[in-house]
Amino acid sequence: EVTLTPQHGDGDEAVYAGCVLLSGKGGVLVHDIGINGTTYRHYAREDYIEQLALLEPELLIISLGTNDSYSYSFSMNSFRESLDRTIHLVQEALPRTKILLTTPPPSYFRQAHGGQHGRHRQSKASTVSYTFNDNARRVAAEIMRYAEANGLAAFDLYSAMGGEIGVEQWIQDGLIANDRVHYSVRGYERQGQLIAEALQAALGA
């Protein structure tokens, strides 16, 4: 049991952002930070990066881009600005931390049709269709371009999964959730395995 008691005077504000419990054992220490629906723009904040810097990570793996790309009104210019600002804030706060960018995996736009219900309307079953999200491919290409231009390590998860063609096999294997944006537990485990294998190859392990 852990009890936190803020110590502050009148008019002061205490903000709880999280805590880290260490076992004291050796080995690799991994922090997994993420919030559903976030984009590069959400992390491009000085206050957040300052908190991140307290962890003093040796390696920071940034896996974003799916939510950035999941919009019919997607703007590449806005994405570039958010990506660049996030990286610059990280580099300023964590100059000794190595950065690894990963690209978003393939995804689909989901559209529901029909299913009207009302007092004077005849209800009918709705149908769902899926359209491949080409913005994910564009974001993946931009992340790889940005990484090369700025001397950063990057792993192209989009291509490693086979892109628009290869993702069909992932669907057949049950590795993608029904919304075709998120992945199943096995799907995320497979993504993690691909990234881990790429890291091991880069480190010569």
Describe each region flagged by the PLM.
Residues 1-85, 92, 182:
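Conserved SGNH/GDSL esterase-like catalytic core that processes O-acyl groups on lipids
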Residues 31, 100, 153-155:
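Hydrophobic/aromatic beta-strand patches that form the interior of the parallel beta-sheet core
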Residues 34, 103, 158:
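Residues at the C-termini of beta-strands that transition into short coil/loop
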Residues 45, 107-205:
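Catalytic His-Asp segment of secreted/periplasmic serine-dependent ester chemistry enzymes
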Residues 62, 101-102:
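Structural beta-sheet core signal
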Residues 68, 105-108:
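Short, catalytically relevant binding-site loops at active-site mouths
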Residues 80-87, 140, 192:
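Short, hydrophobic/amphipathic alpha-helical packing segments
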Residues 94-98:
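A short helix->loop->beta-strand "cap" motif at the edges of active sites that frequently abuts
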